[in-house]
C-alpha cells in the first residue's frame, strides 16, 4: 500500500518576512499544516521562499502576500511581492479599523475629542448650588 503524495503549486502564498539582506529580494517563511497519516494529527511544516521586492519596501516581521512568477527570475527567486498585508508593529483591529497593541487600542491625541468641563456639566444638568 503506497501513500500518494501530492505537491502544492500555489500561485498565491501568505508568509512572514525573515530576511531582507539581499538586494531587491525578501526571504519569506510560509507555514502550512500537514496531516500525519499515522497519527492523524496536523503538524506545522515550514518552507522558505525568495521573493522579488523591486521597491525594497519589506522589513523583517512583515506579513506579505506573494504571487508566483510565470517564469523564474533566478534559480531561487520564483515569486514576487504582491502586497504587504500587515506591517510589523502596525496591527489593525479588523472589526473597528483602529490600531491596537494586544487588547488595547492605540489612540493618538489628535483623534481624541476634547470637551470643556462646563459643557459636560450642562449635559448632565448638574448645578453647583443646591
Curated annotation (Swiss-Prot):
What GO cellular component term, any one, is given? mitochondrial small ribosomal subunit
Name the keywords, alphabetized: Mitochondrion, Ribonucleoprotein, Ribosomal protein, RNA-binding, rRNA-binding
Main localization, broad class: mitochondrion
- Which residue ranges traverse the bilayer? none
A GO molecular function held by the record: structural constituent of ribosome
Q: Which Gene3D superfamilies match?
A: Nucleic acid-binding proteins
Pfam families in alphabetical order = Ribosomal_S17 (PF00366)
Looking up InterPro entries in the UniProt record yields: NA-bd_OB-fold, Ribosomal_uS17, Ribosomal_uS17m_metazoa
Biological process according to GO: translation
SUPFAM superfamilies associated with the record: Nucleic acid-binding proteins
Location of this chain's protein in the cell: Mitochondrion
CDD domains with a match to the protein in the record: Ribosomal_uS17
Which family, according to the similarity comment?
Answer: Belongs to the universal ribosomal protein uS17 family.
Subunit structure and binding partners: Component of the mitochondrial ribosome small subunit (28S) which comprises a 12S rRNA and about 30 distinct proteins.
**Protein's name according to its UniProt entry:** Small ribosomal subunit protein uS17m
Query: Which gene is annotated as encoding this protein in its UniProt record?
Result: MRPS17
